[in-house]
């Protein structure tokens, strides 16, 4: 079974080597259990810091996007090197390169591809290209909520929802500025819908239980395409 794992840039912001160790062992466990895994990394605070500085001196959005892409690729290299023999030793810079690297039978790790496109959209595209029926979005909360649980304490996790439900939740909260993409953007939603890809949103601090989460035995949110 093929799956794509989208790792939030916030994973890298914690500067916690244990995160990388747990990720490596989780990928090893998935591989042992018959999964083919692709990984897409976000840019995190590295991307935001460079984008902020560049925006303040008047650099245009397309160039800011490039800074974010390069930051996400730096994170991809970190993950790729940490996986050692599990990974194919190349970070693809386009969908075509991803497809070629995927054919080698190892874990492929990538960051962003092109300006105007979030790493969530990249994750949806590579899920589609690799015939993966599940896209796992690993972020710093347990799943999807009606409002941001880091801001509001009275919100409940939504264990099951559709892409249409997700659109309503995200309505008005999405920005197209470089460095501001969250969860799934409209393009990512369209891609998972057209290829009927299930999305599992989970906490990256629970990667060591990812197989249980994929089985529905742990807390997460499952988004079904409509």
Swiss-Prot record:
Binding-site list for ATP: 6-10, 44, 48, 139-140, 145, 148
Annotated GO CC locations: cytoplasm
What's its catalytic activity?
UMP + ATP = UDP + ADP
The pathway it acts in is: Pyrimidine metabolism; CTP biosynthesis via de novo pathway; UDP from UMP (UMPK route): step 1/1
Q: Name one GO biological process term.
A: UDP biosynthetic process
Sorted alphabetically, the keyword list is: ATP-binding, Cytoplasm, Kinase, Nucleotide-binding, Pyrimidine biosynthesis, Transferase
Q: Which of this chain's residues are annotated to bind UMP?
A: 43, 65, 113-119
Activity regulation statement: Inhibited by UTP.
- Please list the GO terms describing molecular function: ATP binding; UMP kinase activity
Instruction: State the compartments where it is located.
Output: Cytoplasm
Read off the CDD domains from this record. AAK_UMPK-PyrH-Pf
Query: What is the enzyme's class at the highest EC level?
Result: transferase
Task: Look up keyword Cytoplasm and say if it applies.
Answer: yes
What's a Pfam family this protein contains? AA_kinase
Which EC number(s) are documented for this chain?
2.7.4.22
Name the family: Belongs to the UMP kinase family.
In terms of HAMAP family, this protein maps to: PyrH_A
The record's note on quaternary structure and interaction partners says: Homohexamer.
Q: Which NCBIfam families match?
A: pyrH_arch
Q: What does this protein do?
A: Catalyzes the reversible phosphorylation of UMP to UDP.
Name of the protein described by the UniProt record: Uridylate kinase
What species is given as this protein's source? Answer: Saccharolobus islandicus (strain M.16.27) (Sulfolobus islandicus)
The encoding gene is: pyrH
